[in-house]
Amino acid sequence: MSDLQSIADRVEIEALRGEFTDAVMMRDYDRVASLFTPDAAWRMPNIPVELTGQEEIRAFGERVPRFVDYLVQTTHPGTIQMEGDTASGRAYICELIHPSDGSSELNYAIYHDRYRRTTDGWRFAERVYEIRYLDTSPLAGSAPPTADGAR
């Protein structure tokens, strides 16, 4: 593989991670599911949730609004190790979560990822969410009122 191909692969994987965060923030669960391979696993052991395949991932996402009023997720670049048509890496996450039960969460976490090149581009073969810091103190702020048609 040429150096140029390696650079292109890294850019595509970084774009995949950004697309995931955007899809989660926009509550676009069809798009979230499409970012995974058909046989992918998404594991969140601290919650605990384990999902296998695009349909389980989509269905979980569609349930999220029942127990989360809003969340803000930011993803920070991590590492990517290329291995031909597969790769592994880590992305660093900060989340503010306001569950519908009125509680609050601020966490810092790591996504441990495995990626696979497909005919549609790079996709997640596995995402494992590891919370490294959790603060359940009440959040001082809130989501602002939304304008008509805003998401």
Where are these predicted regions, by residue range?
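Short, low-complexity N-terminal intrinsically disordered segments enriched in polar/charged residues
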Residues: 1-38
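Binding-site signature for planar aromatic cofactors or substrates
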Residues: 10-18, 30-31, 85, 90-92, ...
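A solvent-exposed, acidic/Ser-Thr-rich amphipathic alpha-helical stretch
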Residues: 29-94
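Short beta-strand edge/turn micro-motifs at domain boundaries
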Residues: 88, 108-138
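Short, surface-exposed beta-strand-loop junctions and turns on beta-sheet-rich folds
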Residues: 95-97, 130-131
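Short, cysteine-centered beta-strand-loop-beta hairpins and adjacent loop/turn segments enriched
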Residues: 96-104
